[in-house]
Amino acid sequence: MVRLTVMVLGLIAAVSGLVTTADAETPVEWFTLGARVHGGFGAFIPVGIRIGLDALQRLNARPREVTVVYYDSDKAPCACIADGVAIATVASPGQRTLQIAAETAPAGAMAVVIIRKKQSGEAVKYTVADSWLPKLAEWNRTLDTRGRYDAAMKAEGLFDMAQMK
């Protein structure tokens, strides 16, 4: 009986872990959330979602377990990427877990995002080159919402990522 109870508890724990990690938003849920938070779902929002999801995976973190510092540039239309990162990581200015830096992104970058795991201090840095601006603008002009999402999620070389201490 004890052995059966231990096996059942182990199975429940394993399934719970699968459910938690598989509990992701669908593309339609991302569109709806992005539009609600940002006021629309242009091509920059899924760039931020992709960065945020990638960081959570690399840092082995769950939403709300990270802090975000976003460096914007004067070349980007607005800090749209930051809103995508925010909805993917559940970081927010109100929780003091998302900051838009006073300093700008370095030359050649339209955005730099540093995402740090609160518990360990481990961090990853993402740089989106300003050479992506024409392609993102084209996606906004020529693709529907789903097309923008898919293009951003599949684009090779969309950002550079570096581990930080």
Task: Put a short name on every predicted segment.
Residues 23-41, 46-165:
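Non-transmembrane, aqueous-exposed alpha-helical and coiled segments at domain scale
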Residues 6, 21-22:
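N-terminal compositionally biased, intrinsically disordered segments and leader/signal-like regions
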Residues 1-4:
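Positively charged n-region of N-terminal signal peptides that target proteins for export
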Residues 7-17:
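Bacterial N-terminal signal peptides
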